[in-house]
């Protein structure tokens, strides 16, 4: 009896994975307003919610749960994007935060440590890495008023569940600042294509569930100022992390992306697998400031704390002296092989999307036969760079 092999999806993807026609059909969908009954409108396939109604729903458990359920469906199975109008209704809170951010940008420029951008050309914008902590330390009262917004909390919990981890980065796009390259985002979106392809296919489905992207508008943003370009439904295309850099996908994005004008205090949230990028600021006199929220699942962490630096120091002489070991396997069990979280002010990416890891430095030291004392100084310097 001949057995038929099961029709299984591929265990790994590659640079050619993903059918363009399938992608085109997915992003050609039209949103059905019946799927988002709590939205006040649907504009260009993106559901729009009223901030006052969100605040009211947050105070009633059943309404809160219904809203989060609707949002979870939008992020996973709908457009992947939602807007909360007047999510931070008190403009004095936004204005004070903007003043804090302007001062931080000025101070960091004077110190020559202003943040670069992973997807934009140098000079197009000003960045504040870790604006969350810097904002909190500069003005704790304003920080508390800012992050007390129900829309931020409900969107984060709708996608990630409780105990999420908030991070934030300010992006101020300068007059004439060019658009970002359209992309997917953290985690897999911060890797080279070759590195992405090393992760099994099911991880390409997991990555979007570990992060939520958000933005707080700090000024009015007509389309000419370059609000975020978004491609609704694109998070539904499974192979997108590897496929979206191909020319036909980039061309389709350029012809079909959506930009919605925003007002000060509006909130935008989207699945990190949505193809997106900051738009070109076509104005000559308007600085477009947003605070980008990158919220992470509590599940993106190991169960135990491990002092990997101490382990690497102990193992380094063994790895140098012992023959017959499968060194890569030992490195994988010991050294920190992932570059995040890190301090992007003191440990910025050089020649790529992410900084070098402890495992990278260990491999490099072993290959070069680096003396212990010299390598240990490298480890100590890396630990210092990673601190906030």
Tell me the role of every PLM-derived stretch:
Residues 90-92, 174-176, 222-224, 237-238, ...:
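Flexible loop/turn segments at secondary-structure boundaries
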Residues 242-318:
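Catalytic core of Fe(II)/2-oxoglutarate
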Residues 81, 165, 179, 209-215, ...:
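Extracellular structured ligand-interaction cores
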Residues 27-193:
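Non-heme Fe(II)-dependent double-stranded beta-helix
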Residues 233-243, 283-292, 373-388:
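C-terminal/domain-terminus segments
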Residues 1-76, 333-341, 345, 349-388:
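Fe(II)/2-oxoglutarate
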Residues 154-155, 180, 188-251, 257, ...:
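Catalytic core of non-heme Fe(II) oxygenases with the double-stranded beta-helix
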Residues 95, 227, 241-242, 280-282, ...:
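Short conserved micro-motifs at the rims of enzyme active sites and ligand-binding pockets
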């Amino acid at each position: 009896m001949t057995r038929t092999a099961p029709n299984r999806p591929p265990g790994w993807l590659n640079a050619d994975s993903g059918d363009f026609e399938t992608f085109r059909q997915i992003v050609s969908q039209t949103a059905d307003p019946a799927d988002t009954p709590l939205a006040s409108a649907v504009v260009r396939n993106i559901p729009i919610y009223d901030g006052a109604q969100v605040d009211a729903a947050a105070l009633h458990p059943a309404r809160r749960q219904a809203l989060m359920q609707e949002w979870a469906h939008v992020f996973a199975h709908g457009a992947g994007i939602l807007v909360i109008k007047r999510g931070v209704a008190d403009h004095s809170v936004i204005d004070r935060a903007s003043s804090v951010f302007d001062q931080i940008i000025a101070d960091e420029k004077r110190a020559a440590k202003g943040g670069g951008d992973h997807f934009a050309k140098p000079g197009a914008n000003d960045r504040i890495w870790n604006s969350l902590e810097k904002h909190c330390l500069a003005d704790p009262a304003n920080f508390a008023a800012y992050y007390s917004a129900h829309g931020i909390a409900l969107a984060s919990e709708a996608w990630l569940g409780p105990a999420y981890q908030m991070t934030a980065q300010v992006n101020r796009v300068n007059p004439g600042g060019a658009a970002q390259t359209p992309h997917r985002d953290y985690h897999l979106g911060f890797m080279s294509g070759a590195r992405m392809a090393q992760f099994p296919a099911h991880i390409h489905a997991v990555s979007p569930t570990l992060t939520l992207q958000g933005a707080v508008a700090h000024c009015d943003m007509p389309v000419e100022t370059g609000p975020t370009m978004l491609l609704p439904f694109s998070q539904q295309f499974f192979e997108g992390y590897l496929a979206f850099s191909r020319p036909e996908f980039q061309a389709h994005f350029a012809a079909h992306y959506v930009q919605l004008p925003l007002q000060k205090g509006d909130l935008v949230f989207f699945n990190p697998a949505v193809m997106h990028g900051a738009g070109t600021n076509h104005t000559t006199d308007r600085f477009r400031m947003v605070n980008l929220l990158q919220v992470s699942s509590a599940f993106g962490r190991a169960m135990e704390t491990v002092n990997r630096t101490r382990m690497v120091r102990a193992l380094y002489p063994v790895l140098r002296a012992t023959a017959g070991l499968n060194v890569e396997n030992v490195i994988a069990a010991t050294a920190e092989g992932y570059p995040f979280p890190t301090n992007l002010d003191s440990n910025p990416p050089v020649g790529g999307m992410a900084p070098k890891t402890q495992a990278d430095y260990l491999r490099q030291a072993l290959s070069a036969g680096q003396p212990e004392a010299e390598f240990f100084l490298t480890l100590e310097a890396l630990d210092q760079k990673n601190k906030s």
